[in-house]
Amino acid sequence: MENKGVITQIIGPVVDVTFENELPRIYNALKIDRGNGEYLVAEVQQHLGNSVVRAVAMDATDGLQRGMEVVDTGPAITVPVGKAVLGRILNVLGEPVDEAGEVKAEEYAPIHREAPAFEDQGTEKEVFETGIKVVDLLAPYVKGGKIGLFGGAGVGKTVLIMELINNIAQGHGGLSVFAGVGERTREGRDLYDEMLESGVLDKTSLVYGQMNEPPGARLRVGLTGLTMAENFRDKEGQDVLFFVDNIFRFTQAPSEVSALLGRMPSAVGYQPNLATDMGALQERITSTKTGSITSVQAVYVPADDLTDPAPATTFTHLDATTVLSRRIASLGIYPAVDPLDSTSTALEPQIIGHEHYNTAREVQQILQRYKELQDIIAILGMDELSDEDKVTVNRARKIERFFSQPFHVAEQFTGMDGKYVTVKETIRGFKEIIEGKHDDLPEQAFLYVGTIDEAIAKARELMKGAE
């Protein structure tokens, strides 16, 4: 027999329900009939006493009234998983929002589950080849790791995310799940259209909880996407890419309902269980013995304050950071990754090997020296530099340009064929530049090419054109 209750109080997205017979468990999904054939789903958060539970609605509470009937569905929110969700846009409840018919899934899974047990986790640190030179050389990603993508508006976060999705699909045959948490609806639509055009949509599942949706949806949509990714990892044995844009909104949503749930606010008005919420999501993103989930998370930094509790809590979980810089974007170098600001825990000789490590460190030293010399160059010009510094500056400028790379997903905008560069080729190219083997080549030859051989071929063409 169904366990039924009655709404006794509604405050914004928070609904109190009285159950006379049996109280639903914490995180159970409650169904409320709006009376027009539509149902509202709410998730139990607290037991208040006197047979009352407090729940957070996953959709707008407009039109609800006290006295309306509520049904305890039994389990937590369950969403479709498996191959059926590929190529689809779903909402927090796993319902399709792309007008392409119902999702014919053979399996459903609850969005709340424990992180993999300690003995099930993979312990080897394995580098994840992205095919993007600047990332693979200086801030390599770890399989089953978490990567923070920091960048302002218009510096290329979305294009970088799309290229990663493309390279995983083409290069590794892997699957991706994209969770748009508190996304602009327009950006979500753009991403869908671009994926459709570039042909990576059938290897991707999109889960959106947009900015205009109530906090309940933004609070749980990350877990919905993660549940789908976990299924690909555990049942299909896949190496999955899990994108979250934006992880900050995942911490912002509970802070909106925290006071309504009767919790005392903590620092800067955030919810007191901020670290617990974040840990529950992040600890599920890991490698197991069957497969891995590698997560790329766009991080919005409120007022550029990295000590704000939301980004600070995110930092503790990250294995690598990829920082996009407006200065580099303004030079026309894309991807606009800042080579000196981006970091990775995998940049260790015992993980990536001595050749890769030494090349990366030398590249950073040259770029750091170039940065120090820029004031002198701006005031006095190149002629005032020592011969040694002139060589360093020339090599640094070539390295900067060699970091640029044509992307597959931007082919229709740039007119250039996208390039996937293996780690081996990347190391060889930068090593040759550092060793001075290409000091005679013009800077332009290094702009928007793949391997060093392409740069040499481009230099020959430039020289022919000059003649």
Swiss-Prot record:
Complex and partners: F-type ATPases have 2 components, CF(1) - the catalytic core - and CF(0) - the membrane proton channel. CF(1) has five subunits: alpha(3), beta(3), gamma(1), delta(1), epsilon(1). CF(0) has three main subunits: a, b and c.
Q: Name one GO cellular component term.
A: plasma membrane
Please list the reactions this protein catalyses. Answer: 4 Na(+)(in) + ATP + H2O = 4 Na(+)(out) + ADP + phosphate + H(+)
Q: Which InterPro entries does the entry mention?
A: AAA+_ATPase (IPR003593), ATP-synt_VA_C (IPR055190), ATP_synth_F1_bsu (IPR005722), ATPase_a/bsu_AS (IPR020003), ATPase_alpha/beta_chains (IPR050053), ATPase_F1/V1/A1_a/bsu_N (IPR004100), ATPase_F1/V1/A1_a/bsu_N_sf (IPR036121), ATPase_F1/V1/A1_a/bsu_nucl-bd (IPR000194)
Family statement? Belongs to the ATPase alpha/beta chains family.
Which keywords annotate this record? ATP synthesis, ATP-binding, Cell membrane, CF(1), Ion transport, Membrane, Nucleotide-binding, Sodium, Sodium transport, Translocase, Transport
Q: Where in the cell is it found?
A: Cell membrane
Q: Which gene encodes it?
A: atpD
**Additional remark text:** The ATPase of P.modestum is of special interest because it uses sodium ions instead of protons as the physiological coupling ion.
Q: What does this protein do?
A: Produces ATP from ADP in the presence of a sodium ion gradient across the membrane. The beta chain is the catalytic subunit.
Q: Does the keyword Nucleotide-binding apply?
A: yes
Keyword Oxidoreductase included in the entry's annotation: no
* Gene3D superfamilies in alphabetical order: 2.40.10.170, Bovine Mitochondrial F1-atpase, Atp Synthase Beta Chain, Chain D, domain 3 (1.10.1140.10), P-loop containing nucleotide triphosphate hydrolases (3.40.50.300)
Q: Which residues does the annotation say bind ATP? A: G151, G152, A153, G154, V155, G156, K157, T158
* Enzyme Commission identifier(s): 7.2.2.1
Q: What Pfam families does its record include?
A: ATP-synt_ab (PF00006), ATP-synt_ab_N (PF02874), ATP-synt_VA_C (PF22919)
List GO molecular-function terms, semicolon-separated.
Answer: ATP binding; ATP hydrolysis activity; proton-transporting ATP synthase activity, rotational mechanism; sodium-transporting ATPase activity, rotational mechanism
**Protein name per Swiss-Prot or TrEMBL:** ATP synthase subunit beta, sodium ion specific
Q: Mainly localized where?
A: membrane
